[in-house]
From Swiss-Prot:
Lineage: Bacteria, Bacillati, Cyanobacteriota, Cyanophyceae, Synechococcales
UniProt organism field: Synechococcus sp. (strain WH7803)
InterPro entries: D1/D2, Photo_II_D1/D2_sf, Photo_RC_L/M, Photo_RC_L/M_CS, PSII_D1
Disulfide bond sites: none
Protein name in the entry: Photosystem II protein D1 1
Record site: Tyrosine radical intermediate: 161
Length: 359
């Protein structure tokens, strides 16, 4: 007598699904982080496109003066944006079911929260998916560490800054000119250009661009010739070849003589670590700076710091920058503030010795 034991098809289906999710043979790796990443990024992308094209104006300042951000309300690609949720909503979680109607949800900028929250979850999962694929392939985990820099920057402007300021209306708008407006207002309110962490971020981004260009040009200039004059040098490389495709000794010798010996790396591994670490650390510090300024720990203030022997102010570039900040401050949200507090608190500057006689 023969006994046959048949497993439940449900268990087999779940096992097949698990194997498919974690398989590195798929054209695109899914992974367990991808199971959450795919729907959240699809939701964020879909809502962003629809809102960018057709969303009605949003009462961003909470004063019943809606701001139009979509294309069908007169914007173009440069001026259009998904406008942040209303200051009347503040930091409240505002999904569709919290509004009395869809019109109210749109008027208060609900799509902004939908896009931002799904987008942040999606990029967090993308970072986790990078680690997961590295783990499956037996690679080291530094790819996701590098990606953590832009993730930290996005988290700073979309999540931490609104938390610190007390309203999602202070988050960065999802558009080109809206991003520029966010930057100008950030400078006006927090003096970010005078914050050391922002300076480190500038050094990281510009320095990373410089080092990338230097490295690429040095490698391209010291390729080992494998082709004739009539062929492209790119044909001299075969994918997966064991031998070096460029002469690092020649590149090291050139750069060492161009600058000085110890400015040039003689170890390819330490060189590429440096190329990765420099911009990543810089962007980390920028994100940290935005996150601290979110709670009003602002950039340095050197206004009126130099006086002459009689106590009169000798203006510096810090004072010029301060005047620019005040100008941007009075221009933004001009209908929400009757008078900017930082101007009202300053001493008045006389503009005439006496008033002209009238009549």
């Amino acid at each position: 007598m023969t006994t046959t034991i048949q497993q439940r098809s449900g268990a087999n289906g779940w096992q097949s699904f698990c194997e498919w999710v974690t398989s590195t043979n798929n054209r695109l790796y899914v992974g367990w982080f991808g199971v959450l990443m795919i729907p959240t990024l699809l939701a964020a992308t879909t809502c962003f496109i629809v809102a960018f094209i057709a969303a009605p104006p949003v009462d961003i300042d909470g004063i019943r003066e809606p701001v139009a951000g979509s294309l069908i309300y007169g914007n173009n690609i440069i001026s259009g944006a998904v406008v942040p949720s209303s200051n009347a909503i503040g930091l409240h979680f505002y999904p569709i079911w919290e509004a009395a109607s869809l019109d109210e949800w749109l008027y208060n900028g609900g799509p902004y929260q939908l896009v931002v929250f799904h987008f942040l979850i999606g990029i967090f999962c993308y970072m986790g998916r990078e680690w997961e694929l590295s783990y499956r392939l037996g690679m080291r985990p530094w790819i996701c560490v590098a990606y953590s820099a832009p993730v930290a920057a996005a988290s700073a402007v979309f999540l931490v800054y609104p938390f610190g300021q007390g309203s999602f209306s202070d988050g960065m708008p999802l558009g080109i000119s809206g991003t520029f407006n966010f930057m100008l207002v950030f400078q006006a309110e927090h003096n970010i250009l005078m914050h050391p962490f922002h300076m480190m971020g500038v050094a990281g981004v510009f320095g990373g661009s410089l080092f990338s260009a230097m490295h690429g040009s040095l490698v391209t200039s010291s390729l080992v010739r494998e082709t004739t004059e009539s062929e492209s040098q790119n044909y001299g490389y075969k994918f997966g070849q064991e031998e070096e495709t460029y002469n690092i000794v020649a590149a090291h010798g050139y750069f060492g003589r161009l600058i000085f010996q110890y400015a040039s790396f003689n170890n390819s591994r330490s060189l590429h670590f440096f190329l990765a670490a420099w911009p990543v650390v810089g962007i980390w510090f920028t994100a940290l700076g935005v996150s601290t300024m979110a709670f009003n720990l602002n950039g340095f203030n050197f206004n009126q710091s130099i006086l002459d022997g009689q106590g009169r102010v000798l203006n510096t570039w810090a004072d010029v920058l301060n005047r620019a900040n005040l100008g941007m401050e009075v221009m933004h949200e001009r209908n929400a503030h009757n008078f900017p507090l930082d101007l009202a608190a300053a001493e008045s500057t006389p503009v005439a010795l006496q008033a002209p006689a009238i009549g």
